[in-house]
Amino acid sequence: MLVTNKELQQAAREGKYAIGAFNTSNMEITQAIIAAHEELRAPVIIATSTSAIEYCGIEVLSTMVRQMAMQAKIPVSLHLDHGTDFNLIVKCIRHGWTSVMIDGSHAPLEENIAITKEVVKMAHAVGVSVEAELGRLGGIEDNISVDEREARLTDPDEAERFVHETQCDTLAVAIGTSHGAYKFKGEAKLAFDRLAEISKRISVPLVLHGASTVIPEIIEKANQYGAKLGAAKGVPAEDIKKAISLGITKVNIDTDLRLAFTASVREFLVQKPDNFDPRKIIGAGREAIKQVVKSKIELLGCAGKA
């Protein structure tokens, strides 16, 4: 069944767990995400980036995910990830997205507040929840690129004012994570003190972007079959758990799914060179994604919460 992020994250905040927001761009990824959550009876947020919408077409993507969500035995939210174009946000709402993100983090604070208020007013009028972002992440993923020098952490004072003025439903905060597979040059150093202060001062559920763990075994497997991902490094699982204990209720995961898919498809093609059935080839990637998603559900503590 289709629900909103607000509903899922409010329950997560009360229950002290987090919901996974997993990015999709095709049928097989969506199938894997939903199947994993059904098996573990967990609610899920299926996230779609601007580039995924461009890749599939908004009508196709909307119809596919909504149909699967309505047939699912668990609560599913269809969410626009990193929406920066007001017109696209409008289109997503009209095509049945139950939650949208307005990412005005690239703009000065006053401008971010203004555009977020505009989106909130429109979305709330039709029962769609709104995620906003304050502070910036480094790294590259899809159409989001932020130089390390530009990246900045969320200021607690600004966060308190921002939520009060915009009335957004959830807030994505920057505490040191980044997009993509190369998140840290050394050890991960997340700003947990800052997160705790923000969580104490604002009333809405919090979101952590750039939270893939970049599983070493999957990197090793991918490299074994021809990939070149030597320096890939993600957020440690222990840090994810600590962030949840400090108020994070939505954890965005995309890179880990891409890596799992790539590693397993590479393995399949090498081990079965005589197979040319696209369904079998892609099916190997789908199963790998499903297993990774199941491990994330356990990490986030949302198994059995549907």
What would you call each of these model-derived segments?
Residues 1-20:
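N-terminal amphipathic alpha-helix/helix-capping segment at the start of soluble metabolic enzymes
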Residues 2-5, 58, 262, 293:
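Alpha-helix initiation and N-capping motif
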Residues 5-11, 26-52, 58-75, 83-205, ...:
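Alpha/beta enzyme core
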Residues 224, 235-306:
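C-terminal alpha-helical cap/extension of soluble enzyme domains
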